[in-house]
Amino acid sequence: MAKKVAVIGAGVSGLISLKCCVDEGLEPTCFERTEDIGGLWRFKENVEDGRASIYQSVITNTSKEMSCFSDFPMPEDFPNFLHNSKLLEYFRIFAKKFDLLKYIQFQTTVISVKKRPDFASSGQWEVVTQSNSKQQSAVFDAVMVCSGHHILPNIPLKSFPGIEKFKGQYFHSRQYKHPAGLEGKRILVIGIGNSASDIAVELSKKAAQVYISTRKGSWVMSRISEDGYPWDMVFHTRFSSMLRNVLPRMIVKWMMEQQMNRWFNHENYGLAPENKYLMKEPVLNDDLPSRILYGTIKVKRRVKELTESAAIFEDGTVEEDIDVIVFATGYTFAFPFLEESLVKIEDNMVSLYKYMFPPQLEKSTFACLGLIQPLGSIFPTVELQARWATRVFKGLCSLPSKETMMADIIKRNENRIALFGESLSQKLQTNYIDYLDELALEIGAKPDLVSFLFKDPKLAVKLYFGPCNSYQYRLVGPGQWEGARNAIFTQKQRILKPLKTRTLKASSNFPVSFLLKFLGLFALVLAFLFQLQWF
């Protein structure tokens, strides 16, 4: 059984891995190359090599109730969508609550992770680290890689003929921090992901003109959904997930298109996606349609060629006097401290069982966390990954044979291509609730809805028709939390708390609304009875 665990990285995945190790009675040591926790979500004015980078205005795309760890709800006064600084505050509260900082060695870089000579029998690893120009070696029973996949910028310059002639400024979105210095410029943003849209919207308030160039377009969603609730509280329910899984794909695709176009007609705005795939990760942006409507952002097709100061697009249109090009073209990733044969990366893909375990190892003592792009919050996802990994390390859960794992990897990749396509940004894409349930099933934490229907029907209804948040995976099994049921029933209270900052008189709309519904139902009954007279 593993005892000593090396955790590489003190971002979101690293912090929750530390907690899960402690929960399972393991002895973790976390190596963090910087001076603080938070990883991607800790904003710094300067870009650092080997570390993820964000712009100052980043807001979460998933709401607080869908993003919190399963036994630690966010404070009720926190906004529903958090600025990066507020999310970092939550991580600090979390780390302090569970006393995690004592396990972290800051400003320590992992140089190498190698199997010990007796790995086939011991499953142990030799980890070499460096701190203050001094290297040290230590032996661990298991390793959890939590270093993320938003580190190496992808800038496909070869796809932009004439870039060498361009006399303006160009850079990857990783280098963007805020609009300072770009006021009054004519700016071209390449890409239509979340970062591209955020940056374009922010720049459009300061620049002379902003253009977005997109090859295939994208659906755009608001964070605000029905009745003003966060989008993911409405979208991610077991009921809606079931419908998406059982209905024919073309029907689901049509339904989603109708839903997306309810906010605005994407075709009229030049944003309608040109792909045949069922699911393409939508862009979450509340302001993009407005900025297009104002004319401060113009949507263009793919760039065919660049000149010294102009962009020529594939439809033949030309935009002159371009000052700046921002490449919001995604990321690739690498693990320089690992042997290539351990986690082989090909075309931004890794062959890991359920995105976590290398299938070829004799002992299951190594796991990658967070190498996934769920259509939902990454935080509950990596938490379940960590809960499973630590139980595998302890020998409480086991992995199938190498052949079974390889077959699963191949099948999963085929399904991913059918659903999401093969673009760079889709290589790690997966369905949200399905994947969470898979992991929960492995550790015995998936709630049995039929069982709850008999012993706690109110809870069963919440589980099936309500938001599928992380609390559901603390109701049963190992790590069961006695506060999980209450957290599920009080989530609406925590959603509304930061919104109700102005006291209002009690609304009298309910009786009127109820009366109208009653009269409507009565009218339907009368119409039905009247119809029967004609038979």
UniProtKB/Swiss-Prot annotation:
Known tissue expression: Lung.
A single GO molecular function term of this UniProt record: NADP binding
Keywords: Acetylation, Endoplasmic reticulum, FAD, Flavoprotein, Isopeptide bond, Magnesium, Membrane, Microsome, Monooxygenase, NADP, Oxidoreductase, Transmembrane, Transmembrane helix, Ubl conjugation
GO-annotated cellular components: endoplasmic reticulum membrane; membrane
EC annotation from Swiss-Prot or TrEMBL: 1.14.13.-, 1.14.13.8
The keyword GTP-binding is assigned to this record: no
Residues that hold NADP(+) according to the record: 60-61, 195-198
Main location: membrane
Binding site for FAD: 9-13, 32, 40-41, 61-62
Catalysed transformations (reactions): N,N-dimethylaniline + NADPH + O2 + H(+) = N,N-dimethylaniline N-oxide + NADP(+) + H2O
The name this protein goes by in its record: Dimethylaniline monooxygenase [N-oxide-forming] 2
